Structure formats: C-alpha cells, structure tokens
Amino acid sequence: MAGGRYRAGVQQDRRTPAPAWRVTSGEPDPGTVERLLRSLPDWFGIESAVEGYVAAAARMPAYLAWPADASASANASEPTRTSQPPGISETAGTSEPANPSQPAGASEPADASQPAGALLAARHYPGAAEIYLMAVDPAWHRRGAGRALVAALEADLMADGVEFLQVKTLGPGYQDAGYERTRRFYAAVGFQPLEEIDGLWPGNPCLIMIKSLRGPRP
C-alpha cells in the first residue's frame, strides 16, 4: 500500500459548490474510521461488523479525504502531488450516493479539519486489489469525497502495476435504498457487476463489482 501521498482535485457539484479535496494515505487511523462508521447507521448498523472494520483499520493504511481549505493538515511535511479525479459509498465499499446533481443531504460540518471520508484497500495478488471499506461522513455526501478517494487509490495502484480493482457490496437481491445508491456510485466510477453470491454474508447477498485499471490497448 502506498504511503505518505497527497493529491488535490476540484470536484464540481451542479447545484452546491463542492470543495477541493486533499487525499492523504499512510498510517492506520482506526479512530477516524470508527467515527465515520458510527455516523452511517443505515449502512453500518451491525455492531459486530463495525468492531471488525475498526479492528482492521488498526492495521491497514488509510486513505483519508480532507476538505482542501481545512485549517488543519494530516501531515504538513508530506510530499505533494496533484491530480484532477474524473468527474463522479458501505460494506467493503462506501456510503456516498452517486448523483452529484442533487444537493448535499446535510449541512457542512462545523469542524472541517477532520477527514470527511476514509478508504481501506487490500492487495490479494500483485495484479489485483480490493476496496475493503469506504465511508464518507453523511454531511459531506454528494460533494466529491468518495470519488476523490477512489481516484487517489487507483492512481497508486496503477503506478504499482495493479490491473484489477474489486469491491463487494450488498447485492440487489436484497432491497435497500441506501445500498442501491452505493451500487450506483460504483457504477458511476467505472465498476461493473460481476456476480451476486450467497453465503459470504449469511442472509445477505454479496455483489462483486470489478474495474479494469489497464489503459486502452494499442
């Protein structure tokens, strides 16, 4: 997992001006992950699942999305890089809804110096990775934090030769409005549904979505 990285990109909401986002990666941050998960009971409402994600967050490097104009920085000495993420969240995924044309669902948080979103990624093989977890504070939904996190991860993975990225989320076999938005978000950032399977999460269908990180072939 890449560490100590920085990017900034401007995300444009058609109705509500979106902030620029600064994405950092490096050290585990279980405290931030727990705060974000507990702000999203409609997606992360099972206590044992929250505890499991927080335990994983204690050992996995975290990508964090910060409002770029926040007064506090995660690490002012980090090397910087800039990118313009392409215009576009839950279990092994994210909680950020997909449609940036809708106004933000909640007012901007008073303390913009805290990370608005977090992403954890797993490398299963040299050429394949997974979004293990992504969560965005509901006050920042539809403001571009989720897409900035995905873009930062993809840039690092492609630089390291990774060809495929997957995410697992609740499948359409279980009707849930929140997870329907999650699936739309992943489709909007380029993921394709591969297979819905039973048994991985007892009583809940798991949808595997994948994305190729390879550029167009000559």
Predicted regions and their residues:
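Conserved GNAT acetyl-CoA-binding A-motif
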Residues: 157-178
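A short, internal acetyl-CoA/4′-phosphopantetheine-binding micro-motif in the GNAT/acyltransferase core
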Residues: 134-142, 171-173
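Acetyl-CoA-dependent GNAT
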Residues: 16-88, 101, 109-133, 137, ...
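Short glycine/proline-centered loop/turn elements that form peptide/ligand docking sites
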Residues: 179-182, 196-205
